[in-house]
Amino acid sequence: SSERYVIPGGKLWKRKCYANLRFPVGKIHEDQYITYKAFFDCNRVVTVDVSLYFYWVNPNGITKKGFSLQRYDNIEALTEARAFYLNNDKNDLAAKADSMRELFIAMYSIYAREYHIYADVDMQYKMSRMKAGRIIKNQLGYDSWEWHMNKCFPIYIKLHSYLKKICSFFGK
């Protein structure tokens, strides 16, 4: 795929790319707020299709903590990225940022319910379970949809999984 994640990890940067950029204080997903700006100012970006970066899992990092309202910082960052792209006449990138924003709202709607904090979620980030499921399935595919839906509807997904196996067994 020609699309790449725009996070700082796994990339080599010239110092000047970040010379005028600062990570926002008090935000998680802080890289989402500035990395797109660093890429935007680059004259040339080179990619290789080789795994050279190995992610270290911090047992105390945000990916290992439970879901919290702070995760919505990511959506705020995507909203800012969308505005940035629109201001720079990059409508295709604005559309991608908007699509990612919608996907994260969908996923976070599921997680917020699982962690019993949905009542505290800002209204602009609330989404029905059905709409969230549709967005996840359309953007990420069936397997990812099944995994996320298991978080919301564990009994339904188990039944769905059994029916799928039965149909497969009978060749249907």
Residue map of PLM features:
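Hydrophobic alpha-helical core bundles mediating ligand binding, dimerization, or RNAP-core interactions
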Residues: 32-35, 78-82, 104-108
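Membrane-interface aromatic/basic loop that binds lipid-linked glycans or pyrophosphate carriers
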Residues: 116-172
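Gram-positive cell-envelope targeting signals
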Residues: 8-9, 27, 39-42, 48, ...
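Short, charged, amphipathic alpha-helical segments
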Residues: 93-101, 124
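Amphipathic alpha-helical repeat scaffolds of TPR domains
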Residues: 98-112
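Donor-binding/catalytic cores of nucleotide-activated saccharide
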Residues: 1-46, 56, 60-69
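Catalytic core of nucleotide-sugar-dependent glycosyltransferases
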Residues: 52-58, 65-91, 110-139
